[in-house]
């Protein structure tokens, strides 16, 4: 089976979003222990509360929370690809390793595209 170049590019863009892009913004904030340095109790109470919470957590606890947030982001991407497949949206009707969500998981794990 050969998929269009666009398919591989989109899956790889989603992988990048998970490991280095939008999916890592919250992860990096949690690891740093600061959700929003500009937040105050008056101006942004929820973000300030997040800062207070993160400050109380140990590095190990922050790493655990970061892992959970990263997993949730990946889960959202996974579910989106499943929905595209179920709706038979081109080019996501199927994938190389089952469905496109399987290809996402494979690429996140270092799997190479067929023919590469």
Regions found by a protein language model. Name each.
Residues 6, 27, 65, 103-105:
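Alpha-helical protein-protein interaction elements
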Residues 59-60, 64, 71, 75:
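Surface-exposed, polar/charged faces of alpha-helical domains
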Residues 75-116:
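Amphipathic alpha-helical binding modules
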